Amino acid sequence: MTRIPSSDITDQRFYLNRRAFIASALAAAGASAFVNPELHAQQPAAHGRKLATVKSPLSGSETPNKWEHLTTYNNFYEFGTSKSDPAVNARGFKPREPWTIAIEGECARRGTITLEDVLKGQTLEDRIYRHRCVEGWSMVIPWVGFPLASLIKRCEPTSKAAFVEFTTLLDRRQMPGQESDVLQWPYVEGLRMDEAMHPLTILAVGLYGETLPNQNGAPLRLVVPWKYGFKGIKSIVKVRFLAKQPVSSWQLAWPQAYGFYANVNPAVQHPRHSQAMEARLPSLFQTMRTLPFNGYGDQVASLYAGMDLRRNY
């Protein structure tokens, strides 16, 4: 993983939707630093059950964001579109027990499996990864999880399986954001098979050595550290193996802004803003240059050899 030199960290204004407007106003008044207020608007999540883990050699060495940052500033539209909504609206979410995952499509072992069964004999790993949101902010997150490849191998995909599609739980009673029309529900995401099998790609079940809080995607979510955060689908209930590329939820909603690959790329800007810089939360003023593939290019760039990454964004 590419390290970010201190010379790449700058102290300049960073515009991030309506929250950045507040920051820029303070800067004009002479403020030298600004902490995003939504990071402190809610009580952090209660701590979960401790998990037995081992440190992965693929884990990064950067200092993770604090628990309160990670559990009060979230994109989880099933619980609302504001960053503080999930911390409030997911409090009463009760993941069904047993949590089941439907396995469908081009594989030999179709059916329904429980998360408990998936985790039997599975070594849970601590993985400190960078997290880069398409909105222009970033964090460092200490996930607990296991390689997605281990689940895929268990499903025995056929030679026709070129893609993996994931689906989030549809439960409007518990997930009030699904009453809105901001997206078509349930949320759907996908990966090319080689991306899904890559050692960096994990299914996360925890955070900071504990079970995953509701607002972070409990009980099971996808983590692909070289892609923008919207690829990290949460509360997964279905995995489907496909011969053709699936259409993800954000692709369907706004294809000019959200591509299937969603690799972090400072050279390809979002229609509303540049992707060249990012704000490392909790500060909106601690900004740094965004690295191709979020700094994981040494490990993953070969997956896209010969591809036009401006076109295949």
Regions found by a protein language model. Name each.
Residues 1-16, 20, 27-31, 39-42:
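N-terminal secretory signal peptides
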Residues 44-313:
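Structured, non-membrane catalytic/scaffold regions adjacent to prosthetic-group chemistry
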